[in-house]
């Protein structure tokens, strides 16, 4: 019986995983350089964790079921609720706290380019700081990660402020601006006529036209005040905070920063600043997204903890790296293939241990194949050197070493090799 891989899921073979692990490690190293520390949490959570604040659409996309104890549980569709659950479970965490995580997440969506039902997601969050400095650091970390992956100049970051949008919508006459956020989030995906019909349920015709005009274009931060001139004072106060954040963020990256009032993010827990990054061609879905969610902690404790963060999925990053010819990995370690043809079955093990202990890679021949077959195999798995230990070499404490790149071959004293392996 043939059992096929499930739709929307991926297999990752060794060559692919080497590259994937390399770019994940670069993300980790970048976060650590900013002072962020790694956390982890279960892949399975209570369904209530997502019903409370993530929004109806996300709940409908979960891989959920009733467990043997009668509890409704789900494979985690995102990391933020679990992270906040962890944060609020302890009182000894010093603020501001900087955390990152790299879980697998699951959503029952229709698979398409850059979207799968299971993917690896890098998350970074800062807790206990509500300031333009904190917002800029988070956006700056996201940008630095992309730059360190070799993508500098290949993306731009679109920024908005949910509080700002709420104030604008109230100024335009909406009594329930938060209800319009899911609609605005689909602005670029909807037919304009259908979009306006939906707006007219909350706004009059003139206000709908004004809002569509605001959403149509990405604008420079210096043009925001002119664009929003005449709106309430509260609007202009939020604009000032955005300008302060932009001024700081621009010191982290040379990539283009835009104000895009259509960016509100789909999840209902976002509060202040929100942002997304896209490739400059505009052909791919969002590379990353994030924002501020200062009120999410209230679901767990009677206290608001300022929080801001972002997430990067591995699927879109893979597409972008491939399009820029960056989907490759060169291991800097030397790879040795060690063959023991002596009468002593353990003669090669010390050499294997010494190679591995030096930080390099040692692979042992375990099938006792013909030498020509061994050489072809060693070359196929990208080994740099072949080491042969036979009775003749062993009697004089020597070994034969062959450079598989140049095909040069020589005998070498075993002790000399061990003592100079990294020279």
Curated annotation (Swiss-Prot):
- Residues passing through the membrane, by range: none
CC per GO annotation: cytoplasm
Q: According to the UniProt entry, what is the EC number of this protein?
A: 6.1.1.21
Catalysed conversion reaction: tRNA(His) + L-histidine + ATP = L-histidyl-tRNA(His) + AMP + diphosphate + H(+)
PROSITE patterns the record matches? AA_TRNA_LIGASE_II (PS50862)
Q: Which UniProt keywords apply?
A: Aminoacyl-tRNA synthetase, ATP-binding, Cytoplasm, Ligase, Nucleotide-binding, Protein biosynthesis
The top EC class is ligase
Q: Name one GO molecular function term.
A: ATP binding
Q: Which GO terms describe its biological process?
A: histidyl-tRNA aminoacylation
Q: Where in the cell is it found?
A: Cytoplasm
Q: Please give the family membership noted in the entry.
A: Belongs to the class-II aminoacyl-tRNA synthetase family.
Listed HAMAP family: His_tRNA_synth (MF_00127)
What is this protein's record name?
Histidine--tRNA ligase
């Amino acid at each position: 019986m043939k059992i096929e891989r499930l739709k929307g899921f991926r297999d990752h073979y060794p060559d692919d995983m080497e590259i994937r692990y390399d770019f994940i490690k670069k993300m980790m190293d970048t976060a650590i350089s900013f002072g962020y520390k790694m956390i982890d949490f279960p892949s399975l959570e209570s369904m209530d964790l997502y019903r409370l604040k993530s929004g109806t659409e996300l709940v409908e996309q979960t891989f959920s079921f009733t467990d043997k104890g009668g509890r409704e549980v789900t494979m985690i569709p995102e990391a933020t609720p679990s992270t906040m659950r962890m944060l609020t479970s302890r009182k000894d965490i010093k603020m501001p706290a900087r955390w990152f995580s790299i879980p697998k997440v699951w959503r029952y969506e229709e698979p398409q380019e850059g979207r799968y039902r299971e993917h690896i997601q890098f998350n970074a969050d800062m807790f206990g700081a509500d300031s333009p400095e904190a917002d800029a650091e988070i956006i700056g970390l996201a940008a630095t990660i992309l730059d360190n992956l070799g993508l500098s100049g290949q993306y731009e970051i679109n920024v908005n402020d949910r509080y700002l949008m709420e104030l604008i919508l109230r100024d335009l006459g909406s009594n329930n601006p938060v209800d319009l956020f899911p609609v605005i989030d689909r602005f670029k995906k909807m037919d304009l006529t259908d979009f306006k019909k939906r707006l007219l349920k909350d706004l009059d015709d003139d206000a709908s036209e004004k809002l569509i005009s605001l959403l149509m274009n990405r604008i420079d931060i210096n043009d925001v005040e002119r664009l929003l001139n005449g709106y309430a004072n509260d609007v202009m106060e939020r604009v000032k905070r955005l300008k302060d954040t932009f001024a700081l963020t621009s010191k982290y990256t040379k990539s283009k920063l835009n104000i895009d009032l259509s960016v509100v993010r789909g999840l209902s827990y976002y509060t202040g600043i929100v942002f997304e990054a896209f490739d400059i061609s505009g052909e791919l879905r969002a590379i990353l997204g994030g924002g501020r969610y200062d009120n999410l902690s209230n679901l767990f404790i009677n206290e608001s903890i300022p929080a801001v963060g972002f997430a990067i999925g591995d699927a879109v990053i893979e597409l972008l790296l491939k399009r820029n010819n960056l989907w490759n990995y060169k291991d800097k370690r030397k790879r040795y293939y060690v063959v023991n043809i002596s009468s002593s079955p353990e003669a090669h093990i010390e050499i294997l241990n010494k190679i591995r202990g030096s930080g390099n890679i040692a692979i042992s021949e375990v099938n006792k194949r013909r030498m020509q077959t061994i050489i072809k195999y060693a070359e196929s798995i990208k080994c740099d050197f072949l080491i042969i230990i036979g009775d003749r070499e062993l009697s004089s404490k020597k070994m034969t070493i062959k450079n598989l790149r140049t095909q040069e071959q020589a005998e070498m004293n075993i002790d000399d090799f061990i003592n100079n392996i990294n020279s």
